[in-house]
């Protein structure tokens, strides 16, 4: 069966996450319904990242096996037409033929995420579901310097959800940059894989540094404590974007 790689963009605000769930509106169920409408087949998609409810993507990747070897542009255009007609906030950006051994999840060698903070006194009127609004002034330089304490291979128990299903809390964080562009602050994270709520936990803890409540040493101590209770607040999903997956 021909395997196709789909690159996706979506606003996750009105979805109960990626993963198909009974009686809930999810990205996977909406995409697979579009695939069924196009092909007449009940097919299952596999994704690089099972994003949570409210999390967005500008470069999510999934794969699906069709029985027929369609033209890639035909797949893209047909799926987009159906998704748009249904009022879904999902777009298929690109479709590629890939070998049978390509796996959107397990073939990935790097995942890139961006977390957006709106740092101003006035609340957002347009992008309220696409940023984390923090009215208190944030010290971006302090946040970036503290973030470097998290880079490298560590036991990230402090920064993962209590419901995380990963067998090991050890991950290698390749980059964690914090920078400002006008009123927006961005956290850029890069690793082969991440734990459940890891980036949102980073964002919430770095906010504590930004407002001056924590120092870089406090963040480092929280990391080494390997204790979920030592984490700062978990930032809301609205600011998180899966931007790219490398293979």
UniProtKB/Swiss-Prot annotation:
InterPro entries: PsdUridine_synth_cat_dom_sf, PsdUridine_synth_TruA, PsdUridine_synth_TruA_a/b_dom, PsdUridine_synth_TruA_C, TruA/RsuA/RluB/E/F_N. Keywords: Isomerase, tRNA processing. Substrate binds at residue 113. GO terms for biological process: tRNA pseudouridine synthesis. Pfam families: PseudoU_synth_1. The active site is at 52 (nucleophile). GO terms for molecular function: RNA binding; tRNA pseudouridine(38-40) synthase activity. Its EC number is 5.4.99.12. Homodimer. Belongs to the tRNA pseudouridine synthase TruA family. This is tRNA pseudouridine synthase A.
């Amino acid at each position: 069966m021909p395997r196709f790689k789909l690159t996706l963009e979506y606003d996750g605000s009105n979805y109960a996450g990626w993963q198909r769930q009974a009686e809930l509106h999810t990205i996977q169920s909406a995409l697979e319904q579009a695939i069924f409408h196009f092909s007449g087949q009940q097919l299952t998609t596999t994704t690089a990242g099972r994003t949570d409810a409210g999390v967005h993507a500008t470069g999510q990747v999934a794969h699906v096996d069709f029985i027929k070897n369609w033209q890639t542009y035909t797949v893209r255009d047909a799926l987009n037409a159906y998704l748009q007609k249904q009022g879904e906030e999902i777009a298929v950006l690109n479709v590629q033929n890939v070998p049978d051994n390509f796996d959107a999840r397990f073939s990935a060698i790097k995942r890139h995420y961006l977390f957006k903070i709106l740092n101003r006194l006035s609340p957002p009127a347009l992008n309220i579901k696409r940023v984390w609004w923090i009215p208190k002034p944030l010290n971006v330089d302090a946040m970036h310097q503290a973030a470097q304490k998290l880079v490298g291979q560590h036991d990230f128990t402090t920064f993962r959800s209590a419901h995380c299903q990963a067998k090991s809390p050890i991950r290698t964080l390749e980059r964690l940059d914090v920078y400002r562009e006008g009123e927006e602050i961005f956290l850029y994270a890069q690793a082969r894989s991440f734990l459940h709520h890891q980036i949102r936990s980073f964002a919430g803890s770095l906010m504590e540094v930004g407002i001056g409540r924590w120092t870089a040493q406090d963040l480092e101590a929280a990391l080494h404590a390997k204790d979920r209770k030592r984490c700062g607040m978990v930032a809301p999903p609205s600011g998180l974007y899966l931007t790219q997956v490398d293979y």
